[in-house]
Amino acid sequence: SMFAYITVANPIFVGHFGIQEQIFGLIFGLNSLGLMITSIVNAKLERKFAPISLLKFGLVMMIICAGFTWFLGKISGLVGFEIALFFTIATNGFIIPTTTLLAMKRHAKFSGTASAILGFLQFSVAGFVSFMVSKFAVLTPWALGASMMICAKIGATLFLVLIFKRCEI
């Protein structure tokens, strides 16, 4: 969902909403700040909660927030859409570092190889998502919200099928 946002954020904010490039830069930075804050909170919470629990929380919140992004993208203006989008982007602070931690923990002996494979997979999926949102001209707020929700649901499904059954809670 992150690369769907990165790919079409400028055309949506500048083209659809008609904001100035400088304001877009501030909004993009604000959304990045939300991601950084939740990453810091996630790191602190990993001392008290199992990483798998934080990942479940992040995935559920991503689906909920992306749903609000889609819904508000259909019915509201810039402010409502941006608030929902901010929280959708911020939930990645629970997902991205935690999936990396779990992958590295499971393959500690081969951490370098595991890291390389994980990076390759992440950027391959990101490239595919970027291609798809570009190909299908996802240039409206509701379409971005829908794309992010689809990505979140696919991620949650993969988590349930591939990871959840093997992890101790």
Predicted regions and their residues:
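Conserved extracellular-gate-facing transmembrane-helix segments in secondary transporters
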Residues: 1-6
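Short amphipathic helix-loop junctions that connect adjacent transmembrane helices
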Residues: 7-22
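Small-residue hotspots at the loop-to-helix junctions and early N-terminal turns
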Residues: 21-29, 115-116, 145
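Transmembrane alpha-helical segments of major facilitator superfamily
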Residues: 26-35, 122
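Helix-to-loop junctions at the C-terminal end of transmembrane segments
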Residues: 38-52
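C-terminal transmembrane helical hairpin of 12-TM major facilitator-type secondary transporters
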Residues: 53-99
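A late C-terminal transmembrane helix in Major Facilitator Superfamily
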Residues: 101-142, 147-148
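Multi-pass alpha-helical transporter architecture, strongest
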Residues: 146-169
